[in-house]
């Protein structure tokens, strides 16, 4: 069955509407903007699908549905190569004999009472495989990890284990 994710949460990019360079600069590393997990999956799936955003679904036999082109095929290819390169340099994420594309994310938790951010973090890792002909995309998210504030130490090993399982299970 397809779950309609279109109305589940909203990303917030209001900070970018004023066009200030500082807001664009800080948004490049995740400050002043927010995105839901499903929107993050949709964005990265557009990279995995040569620039075409797909309608998200979970474990269904229905055919994937293209929504629209959001970036050029060339841009998607360049970003994929960067994501593959990041994994090849990070032994924790690398899966031998496979080309996997992935990216870590570590974000500070907003302080809604005082403004700004708390010292707590959210760790994410998102990736797809095989990088050249993607069959799946995985997002691992961990809220406020204890003792290991960097995504590379928390969610990356979980991604690697799950991706290896999926690759083996489906004989990819």
Task: Give residue ranges: language-model regions.
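Beta-lactam-recognizing serine transpeptidase/beta-lactamase-like catalytic domain environment
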Residues: 1-144, 151, 172
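Short, gly/Ser/Thr-rich active-site loops of penicillin-recognizing serine hydrolases
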Residues: 64-67, 156-172
